[in-house]
From Swiss-Prot:
Keyword Membrane: yes
Membrane topology (UniProt): Peripheral membrane protein
Higher taxonomy: Bacteria, Pseudomonadati, Pseudomonadota, Gammaproteobacteria, Pasteurellales
Name of the protein in question: GTPase Era
Originating species: Haemophilus ducreyi (strain 35000HP / ATCC 700724)
Segments for region (G5): 158-160
Family: Belongs to the TRAFAC class TrmE-Era-EngA-EngB-Septin-like GTPase superfamily. Era GTPase family.
Gene that this polypeptide is encoded by: era
Residues annotated as domain KH type-2: 210-287
Amino acid sequence: MRMIEQAPKTYCGFIAIVGRPNVGKSTLLNKILGQKISITSRKAQTTRHRIVGIQTEEQYQAIYVDTPGLHIEEKRAINRLMNRAASSAIGDVDLIIFVVEGTKWTDDDEMVLNKLRTAKAPVVLAINKVDNIKEKDELLPHITALSQKFDFAEILPISAQRGKNVHILQKIVRKSLREGVHHFPEEYVTDRSQRFMASEIIREKLMRFTGEELPYSVTVEIEQFKLNERGTYEINGLILVEREGQKKMVIGAKGQKIKTIGIEARADMERLFDNKVHLELWVKVKAGWADDERALRSLGYMDE
């Protein structure tokens, strides 16, 4: 009698990465995935979309939701939408990774924690940037104090930048996955389109090369993304700002700043897409776009 070979069990689950702005959530996701999916910058509020990162190892598939940083300020339409996206991300997941920064604890951290009190999924507290803590003896009392604030499933000091204890965090994630079929093919690392990733790369370079000069009233719209007959991606990016002065900041003296942004963005795109890229960038003033929900919808900041 011929024996029927049973397929090995597979496991899959959704993990939300939450925290106030600029604590290293995007850096952590990129470190876990081994490549850049979510954009990073020294500035807060760099992540605006719920980017999904996918890690498949043998029978395990972890699907990561990288949220915008939850924050208190909600005066602008874009901030309200970012808070809404982050809050909805924690509603239906198998595990929540709450990222905080070293021994700092702010009102925004407290606000995020209060939102997590209604979450059904277990919460792992990841204390990031521990390599930057000057007084190392402050860490243990800080962990003790935080453990009294909430019933965390685990508390783990990490350094997303250096990779410290990230492998332990991944083991915790693996234990949280449920038995079930994988949602994505194993070669997928994100569900976002190349067009979307191109806009994110340009936006990262904007954040990186404008320093503290440019506020967050800047976005990128990809007007053309096509593969030409020579096998090169032709990408046209439109950078939207709110004021004429911001346009001058992006362009820079004799166009040098936008040239640098374009060179760096093209290099990242060619690495990510494994293909030659011809990139052209323009800057346009569109006053009030960050306060206009219709404009935000057309730019992909909210679902139709």
